[in-house]
Amino acid sequence: MPDVYGPGASQNDPIPAHAPRQQVLPEEYQRASDDELHRRIREAKDTLGDKVVILGHFYQRDEVIQHADFVGDSFQLARAAKTRPEAEAIVFCGVHFMAETADLLSTDEQSVILPNLAAGCSMADMADLDSVEDCWEQLTSIYGDDTLIPVTYMNSSAALKGFVGEHGGIVCTSSNARSVLEWAFERGQRVLFFPDQHLGRNTAKAMGIGIDQMPLWNPNKPLGGNTVSELENAKVLLWHGFCSVHKRFTVEQINKARAEYPDVHVIVHPESPMPVVDAADSSGSTDFIVKAIQAAPAGSTFAIGTEINLVQRLAAQYPQHTIFCLDPVICPCSTMYRIHPGYLAWALEELVAGNVINQISVSESVAAPARVALERMLSVVPAAPVTPSSSKDA
């Protein structure tokens, strides 16, 4: 039985064979107390000074976030690293595809480090290059000269970003997906969207595209499990991928929140299933959720459909509001949770000793077209800035 990503929503998502594996954390870090680990992290940071920058994703545990120089979403953080050209090492407290993106945007003189190589992303691993290339061949054999534009979500491997770059496509984030799809439809008749079906479906529906024009592509079936006529009728072809955390949210949870808190404002991430997004008051990226709470009048009540670490941090930072997670069962991103303070201390102390461990490096043959896809996205909608942060500014 293969190892699994973690508890809760992730329990049925086996780690694909190609996902990275992490060596055992040295025993001294396993045995160290929390206080000792935090002391060692601080001391290593002080020793390294400007030679290192630590990036912390919104979904990281607080014990890690407190040491981050920047806190934000994956693309904000990758771009934030560019503001520290003097940093020889970029330590990305996130997951594998995020570190890859940081490597794409960093200089040749900088090393990108992922403290725990086992911090992958089940959704990103649901679309691999071989399967996407096979899908592409099947679709282009049907569509002929009709232009098909590939769009990959930021939550994908560098190899897939390179694929879309080579095929006239583009990368999107959860905050700019609509603008990116509009860009794609200015250039082609159809879009192949991967790996997250829910973000693609929710975005296309908001643009007025019918559900019958959004067939799901299952890479394990001929023609993705569709008929030729269904594919010919398609406008957006959705890859059979999903986020293990966000698929947990349900309309029943929203109804329960409204029954208990009549004035509640329900915000969900667009990686949630379509019925959940439809039933919510608003949906948006992690940055959207943070800003909505920051701007709300005191005494507001929010039920939030996203990862629990972010929700709990917001509840602690904004005690003037009532903030809770839609899912009553704790729903962490279990792979993000693999970045334990012990791994961060280990990575930093190895840097102090002159050793670079767990380096994430994208080959130039992949990086060059992947950068093209990212640059196309930036030409459509520039990335929102992220400011330097203490642990408070997540």
Swiss-Prot record:
Binds 1 [4Fe-4S] cluster per subunit. Its EC number is 2.5.1.72. One of its GO terms (molecular function) is quinolinate synthetase A activity. Keywords: 4Fe-4S, Cytoplasm, Iron, Iron-sulfur, Metal-binding, Pyridine nucleotide biosynthesis, Transferase. It is found in: Cytoplasm. InterPro entries: NadA, NadA_sf, Quinolinate_synth_A_type3. It is an enzyme of class 2 (transferase). The keyword Lyase does not apply. Its main location: cytoplasm. Pathway: Cofactor biosynthesis; NAD(+) biosynthesis; quinolinate from iminoaspartate: step 1/1. GO terms for biological process: 'de novo' NAD biosynthetic process from L-aspartate. Iminosuccinate binds at residues 57, 74, 153-155, 174, 269-271, 286. [4Fe-4S] cluster binds at residues 121, 243, 333. Its cofactor is [4Fe-4S] cluster. It comes from the Bacteria. It catalyses: iminosuccinate + dihydroxyacetone phosphate = quinolinate + phosphate + 2 H2O + H(+). GO terms for cellular component: cytosol. Pfam families: NadA (PF02445). Catalyzes the condensation of iminoaspartate with dihydroxyacetone phosphate to form quinolinate. HAMAP family: NadA_type3. Belongs to the quinolinate synthase family. Type 3 subfamily. This is Quinolinate synthase.
